[in-house]
Amino acid sequence: MTSQGHGYARFRRALKSGNAHVALAAAPELRQVGLADALSLLFLIREDKPVLYDKAAVRWFAKYAAEDRYLLLRDARELIDLLDGIGRHDQVAVVRLERWLRARGYDDEADRVA
């Protein structure tokens, strides 16, 4: 297994086990963290390292915005509001984010919404 493969396996195990410390340590070793994995990490950060949530949410938003060629300003505002609500443990925001992602064809990401 390549070092990239080993790092990704360690990252995925950390996500699965809920270990934010290991996931955050493994992420920089990867060439790229996909949007779905980054969203899983965001929810893990919210639970285990809430002081890091705002910055992580901004980074996830930027990653999403760079990927979605059809993102409009009003959609960006809505997504930011949802991420803010999720950071405050608003379950309605969690449900809305899952629906929001599915409506845009981001099913893998929607499946990661905790």
Residue map of PLM features:
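Long, low-complexity, acidic Ser/Pro- and Gly-enriched intrinsically disordered regions
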Residues: 1-114
